[in-house]
């Protein structure tokens, strides 16, 4: 086992897959000589050359479209968005080409493209650099969405995404790049469609993903001191949702709280609650609860920014009240 930063685990995943398959290449703004905005691709251009670690102009629609065309010829592009908010400029390419071409070509083309890069609410990065776009992209048919949260799952998930035949949107939280964790020295892959049970418990199911995993863990420390026994599930796969793992937990706890960073309207929690009400309603002893960011642009001011996000103490209060709910 080696201790590494999350961004180093991502780099290791890309390096290993590029070393195994000459069809894998990465394209994006400053991915080459600069090494990427968060140094995920640092020095890869030295090892693999400027054609496989390709610096692109500031034109997300252009280099995303190029990557889709490259995938149609048999290559395996990794597209780095310098910031996920900028990938809105490629929304046409993602929604009308990337996700649909396998279907519209009658299965003649696979489109093995990974779109990855930093997103989420950072530290005073202001509105345009603090986009939470999982709720936008989840409505696109044919696009799978994965959110990493540890150095371990970042590497294993990205390696699996790179060898997939279908397009993957791979979400990396801007505040998790410097998170450290142990990563196995031997090669490994992780399933892209499975949630992780982070902590087993019997009182209530708390479902979360990405950075909010750590807000939930902080809240659970306090809940445990109060004699409560929550189960924590990290979704990892935001589309499709791993309803099997969630179902097993709900049938044990009969209560669920969903904690997310994306805005409440049309968020991941909204979709999950819809599925729970359809398939697991009779298993619940109380209504499903969601804790989401406020439906506002993210302020630059630090105090205002913090006020838009769900904080650990809010999770503690909601879970405590939920456990007192009487049917």
Curated annotation (Swiss-Prot):
It is an enzyme of class 1 (oxidoreductase). Pfam families: Transket_pyr, Transketolase_C. GO terms for molecular function: metal ion binding; pyruvate dehydrogenase (acetyl-transferring) activity. One of its GO terms (cellular component) is chloroplast. Heterodimer of an alpha and a beta chain. This is Pyruvate dehydrogenase E1 component subunit beta. The pyruvate dehydrogenase complex catalyzes the overall conversion of pyruvate to acetyl-CoA and CO(2). It contains multiple copies of three enzymatic components: pyruvate dehydrogenase (E1), dihydrolipoamide acetyltransferase (E2) and lipoamide dehydrogenase (E3). Its EC number is 1.2.4.1. It catalyses: N(6)-[(R)-lipoyl]-L-lysyl-[protein] + pyruvate + H(+) = N(6)-[(R)-S(8)-acetyldihydrolipoyl]-L-lysyl-[protein] + CO2. K(+) binds at residues 113, 161-162, 164. The lineage of its organism: Eukaryota, Rhodophyta, Bangiophyceae, Cyanidiales, Cyanidiaceae. Keywords: Chloroplast, Metal-binding, Oxidoreductase, Plastid, Potassium, Pyruvate, Thiamine pyrophosphate. It is found in: Plastid, Chloroplast. Its cofactor is thiamine diphosphate. Thiamine diphosphate binds at residue 60. InterPro entries: THDP-binding, Transketo_C/PFOR_II, Transketolase-like_Pyr-bd, Transketolase_C. It comes from Cyanidium caldarium.
